Amino acid sequence: KDFIFEKTYECPVCYKEFKESKVKSSRARLIKQDRDLRNVYQGIDVNKYEVTSCPHCGYSALDKYFTGIAAPQAKLIKENISKTFTRFSRHTIVTYDEALERYKLSLANSIVKKAKDSEKAYTCLKMAWTVRGYMENYDRAADDYDEKMEELKLNEEELILNALEGFISA
């Protein structure tokens, strides 16, 4: 909780205001960097908080892309995401499952709004890093540990491959 603060946003698609949990960058202490440049911080996985999702219309994007949406893209989101979107519950402390659902929604939004390949690739990379964090923090005593690790490892590999292909085509 010491790492988290509430930030208020106005959705660029539906123009409604909402709050989102974000990481206080001054509180997160870097402890290592993986070979693929994923930063690992003590006490918090910042990747779980890098997607901003409007709980009203379903517009979702990585923080760096959230406000940069053109009117034709917003129209595509309203027509293809908002119509079928079901509100999700919001928690201050985001679980890995919640974070991955937000990443999936963010990737779907990127595809629908015809975002650049680099945006889709970066979303896949950040999602892969979140999956890796999930694997590192999953309860080893859980009954489904081996099955869950296999599932998550396959997801991470697929996301890394998608990110690589996206960056190459960008």
What spans do the regions from the language model cover?
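Short coil/linker segments at helix-helix boundaries
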Residues: 32-42, 76, 80-86, 137-165
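A short, charged
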Residues: 54-56, 91-94
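Amphipathic alpha-helical segments of tetratricopeptide repeats
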Residues: 107-111, 129, 164-170
